[in-house]
């Protein structure tokens, strides 16, 4: 594994927060009144999705076969890992490198999650890290918890986000043929992996009702995975530990680690953005790390970046709290 050099992180514009620009944007935003334009098409789609998901939840609890319950759990785990291990840790942060076969695998399971194609997802996430909690942050917590959770998808993007996002260098993403294939074929891929196969397999393999399979394994599971991911943008900037940086809004949170297969170490992640582990939590709370380590064990993942212990300790002593870190690791480590 490769240990991260701090100056190497700072030199890459999509990894480190630009504190000077953040302060400037925050001061400018105080002088402005934000008028959010609602995108009613998105509102209607999400309302319909949540109604369908509630039907699916009822069926999952009272009507679905046990095999379908397990199938829903498996799909959530795979789809989430396509986001966390793929769009997030591999492509947005370049926290490790992978062979073509592994990248194709991650791209396909990412399509289960249906959270925009990986290029768009990584672009938004790089904006989030570079200009955290400003108008150039897609889901800034300064605009409220609901906005950070899902409201940002229900309104038009702020002009500042469009301007700043256009400045990012995304050439590494556009040069990856796997990502370009997904981008060009996104709707068919989502149709197959997010909706068709999740419905078809329970019907064929264990005789589940097509109606129940669709509402549980497709709609409910899709909606649940969305909220698990969104909780990182909202809950993980709201309540939890801040052992690494008390100045940041990000926190480490146990429950978001469980729901989002290992993404809950958010204070750690914002402090050390290129560490492939994204937290110091134990493996049972970081299934994405387990997946990446498995990929390394079979030769498909390499150059996993980690943060040296002395750098973590120095950071905690200067900007965080060593005692809080010890307490957190005692509970979660």
UniProtKB/Swiss-Prot annotation:
- In the UniProt entry, what is the domain comment? The histidine box domains may contain the active site and/or be involved in metal ion binding.
Inducers of expression: Expression is regulated by nhr-80 and nhr-49 in the intestine.
Q: In which pathway does it act?
A: Lipid metabolism; monounsaturated fatty acid biosynthesis
**Do the record's keywords include Methyltransferase?**
no
Instruction: Give the location in the cell.
Output: Membrane
A single Gene Ontology CC annotation of this entry is: endoplasmic reticulum membrane
**Which protein are we looking at?**
Delta(9)-fatty-acid desaturase fat-5
Q: Which organism is it from?
A: Caenorhabditis elegans
Q: Indicate yes or no for the key word Iron-sulfur.
A: no
Q: Name one GO molecular function term.
A: stearoyl-CoA 9-desaturase activity
Reactions listed under catalytic activity: hexadecanoyl-CoA + 2 Fe(II)-[cytochrome b5] + O2 + 2 H(+) = (9Z)-hexadecenoyl-CoA + 2 Fe(III)-[cytochrome b5] + 2 H2O; tetradecanoyl-CoA + 2 Fe(II)-[cytochrome b5] + O2 + 2 H(+) = (9Z)-tetradecenoyl-CoA + 2 Fe(III)-[cytochrome b5] + 2 H2O; heptadecanoyl-CoA + 2 Fe(II)-[cytochrome b5] + O2 + 2 H(+) = (9Z)-heptadecenoyl-CoA + 2 Fe(III)-[cytochrome b5] + 2 H2O; pentadecanoyl-CoA + 2 Fe(II)-[cytochrome b5] + O2 + 2 H(+) = (9Z)-pentadecenoyl-CoA + 2 Fe(III)-[cytochrome b5] + 2 H2O
